[in-house]
């Protein structure tokens, strides 16, 4: 619903044509709430039946690649929620579909457009911070684990927990601020155990 709410703030630029959700009742509610002409429970049917300029993919992570690729192949531009997909091979398939279609594919890495990131970018470009050669990031979440027990905490559907969900923003902003340098070396480690109880 967050994407639809944002799009509805741009009535001169965006007309919401159709809404798709595997839960039909929710699709109908969202279509009614945002004056969409149609609702669907299958994105393939939506792409077959509707003439769309842009598709916004805001599904569980494991569905990003199939939905985005289908939309690109149907001739639509695509805004896909982050992370792009679960594996580099799937992301490459998305890029290949974009290149073949001639359409645009944007991943929702919105933090680079925040005021703080834009200010930091200006400072970096002006040389106010010297040569940037290292970035260290962290994120503390005080509101618990979102969607515990649902797709968000199921690795096969989410892809790997906080690093892929939240860490991707920091990786993106760090690379953006440094001008997307070619890495010399990369190392990493993930840990995806969730506590049974919150303190």
What are these regions (language model features)?
Residues 1-34:
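N-terminal Rossmann-like dinucleotide-binding module
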Residues 14-18, 36, 53-55, 161:
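Short active-site oxyanion
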Residues 54, 60-61, 65-112, 127:
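Beta-strand-loop-alpha-helix segment that lines the small-molecule cofactor/substrate pocket
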Residues 36-43:
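Conserved SAM-binding strand-loop segment of SAM-dependent methyltransferases
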Residues 58-59, 177:
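Short, well-ordered coil/turn residues at beta-beta hairpins
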Residues 111-199:
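Predominantly a Rossmann-like dinucleotide-binding segment in NAD(P)-dependent oxidoreductases
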């Amino acid at each position: 619903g967050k994407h639809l709410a944002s799009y509805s703030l741009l009535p001169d630029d965006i007309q919401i044509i159709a809404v798709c959700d595997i839960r039909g009742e929710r699709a109908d509610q969202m279509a009614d709430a945002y004056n969409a002409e149609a609702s669907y429970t299958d994105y393939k049917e939506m792409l077959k039946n509707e003439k769309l300029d842009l598709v916004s993919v805001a599904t569980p992570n494991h569905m990003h690649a199939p939905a985005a690729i289908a939309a690109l192949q149907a001739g639509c531009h695509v805004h896909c929620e982050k992370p792009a997909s679960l594996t580099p091979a799937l992301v490459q398939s998305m890029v290949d579909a974009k290149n073949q279609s001639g359409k645009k594919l944007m991943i929702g890495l919105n933090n680079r457009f925040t005021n703080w990131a834009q200010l930091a970018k200006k400072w970096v470009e002006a040389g106010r911070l010297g040569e940037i050669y290292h970035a260290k990031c962290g994120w503390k979440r005080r509101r618990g684990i979102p969607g515990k027990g649902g797709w968000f905490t199921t690795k096969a559907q989410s892809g790997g927990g906080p690093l892929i969900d939240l860490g991707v923003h920091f990786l993106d902003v760090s690379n953006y601020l440094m001008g997307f340098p070619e890495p010399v070396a990369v190392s990493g480690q993930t840990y995806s155990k969730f506590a049974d109880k919150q303190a």
